[in-house]
Amino acid sequence: ENLSIQNSEIIYTNDISNIHFHLKENNISIEKKDAQKYLLKCNFLCQRLNYNNKKLIEKKHINFNGPVSLKENNTSIINAHIKIDQLSSLFSLNFFDKNNFILDFKGEGQEISQIILNTPSYLKDIYNSILINGKIQYSGEIKGEVEKENPSLNIDYSISSSSFGLKDNPFYLKEISCFGTISNGLANNFETSSITLEDFIAKTNEGTVEGKGTITNLNSYNLTTDLNYNLSLIETNFYNQDSPFYKMAGRINGDIQYKGKVSFNKGFIYDLMNAEIYSRFNINETSFLYKDFAQKIFIKNAEGIIDSNKINILNSLIKYGRSNLEFSGDIIDLFPNIFNQKPSFHVSGDLSSKEVFVEDFITNNDQNYFKEKLIKNMPDYIEADININLAKINYSKIKISKVSGDLNYKNRAFSTDTIFLNAFGGSVKLSGKFYQSFENNFKISTNTKFDNLDIFNTFYTFENFGQSFIQAKHLKGKISSQFVCNASWNNTFELIPEKLQLSSNLQVNEGELINFKPLESLSSFVSIDDLKHIKFSTLKNNIEIKDMRIKVPTMEIKSSAISLLISGYHDFNQEFKYKISLLLSELLANKFRLKNKDYSANADSTEKLITNVQLTMSGDKNKLDISFDKLKMKEHIQQGVKKEIQNIKQIIKEDIIQKKENLIEEELELEWEDDF
């Protein structure tokens, strides 16, 4: 009635059902309960169990304890206990109609690590790149025909106190709990298999993830999720060591719907970039460094939507140094760029600020940082189309306000169709392009119009444009101009003077020259007091800069003190040469009155002296020379005035020639005409 077998070995082969097994170290006890029921107890070493040419068990110690029922066309095991190594389950097995079977199994409080250890070898690739631990309970059914390759599988499970990590990445989830189902689908294979996750809850070190998901096609995992998250960005610093974002801090929360392939190896990034992703997010009190930026970027708050590779920023408040910026718009292909899937990303939208401090964007504690890092190469990884609206911009002494217009960046080039701004007490409109050439130099080409700029403020702000010939303290007035400019800098942002070209139309209104030494050199003709402060209403000219020379075509200055025509050039090495024509009707009258006190009282009001004195003013920043080119005098004097001509000649001789001893008398050509 009872049977006991010790230390036996059993080898079984059935080519029809394609079942093969080899059992060693068998200790078997069979107790008969009735004619068709037995109690089977056994423990053994299963060397192998193969089914349909697949290795299900290899070298595992197995303990079995349960009832066996043997009936015609039906064999069953009801609520038996089986333990494979440290994995314990209850199961029931029913064979019927000779070829069909149903296997029900159930486990409670089992270690997931034991399931992994006892997973058939042909399935272990599932776990190659992941680490899973924790508790699981399950109940399932395997149903099929013995002679068919794959039976159907359906499992209900729940997980608690579990963890999940990646072998090649520090990404880690802990305290995982969820429940769901596992099924191999209609075709009973990996391709139609699915795993559902319901009420999924997990924690990171400083965050949480909750939601649900489904994994389908275990040959090539497809993941669909609907999750809510609240995460610390500190943890992301370790996920991608090659990311241009580093030293991240702050929090991000939102929801995410993911649909696409997923893998836990090197193909993870590719799958991520090609998935359908939709996420609404909020960022608060976040900071990070980005590439070679000089300072940390602070995001006070931001709200947006991620739609696959497009990030729509609904609103954001960003702080960089002392500058607070508001941005809304789209960022496309940022994630593919971060993960080296695409060479660049594109930003478009609206940027506004109450005040921008330019120095914060180009300097840090290292004085050479700007030259050594930021200027050697303009970035080629970003493209931008931005509408700007900046209330104030500060850079050194430069104060700009009400900046608006479009700013574009592509292929290492900034460009704009139109930007408006206010500066130096006036308004400016500009268009142009600033770019990095193939020679690694930097070039600008701009068409600029400005109206009513304050001359003193302009010269003061730009530190007299690096020259000392004429300075802010010498100038007052309003200047308007339209000019075209081409300029180049080397890769440390030093101007290349020989490549500077400028063509302009300018007009100065309400102009004043104050204590301008070169003009005071004309004191032989005009009172020194008059020359110290010259006022004129309007001055117009076309200025050209080319070949390191500023060319000044003839322009007329009219004032109460002096009227003159000036033309010439001023080189970048501070050498200059100007032609000056003086209209001496008033000049000589002033001198004449000093010598002849009765002239003013006796002269007729219609009498005029018209004399043209042509001078050359040349020199450099260290010296100034003035010489005569030609002196012409015209007269139209009524009868009796010729006598006064001799007095005028005497004045010139005494007051001009004697003071300019280096001038040769023969160079003064006096041309007199009897008629006007």
PLM regions and their residue ranges:
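Hydrophobic/aromatic beta-strand elements that line small-molecule binding cavities or substrate pockets
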Residues: 66, 543, 567-568
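Short, glycine-rich nucleotide/cofactor-binding loops
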Residues: 556-558
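Short acidic-hydrophobic surface loop/beta-edge motif
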Residues: 5, 82, 202, 318, ...
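Conserved Rossmann-like nucleotide-binding pocket used by diverse enzymes
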Residues: 314
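Contiguous, well-ordered beta-strand patches that form the walls/edges
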Residues: 44-48, 55-68
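Membrane-proximal interfacial segments on either side of biological membranes
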Residues: 2-51, 70, 75, 87-200, ...
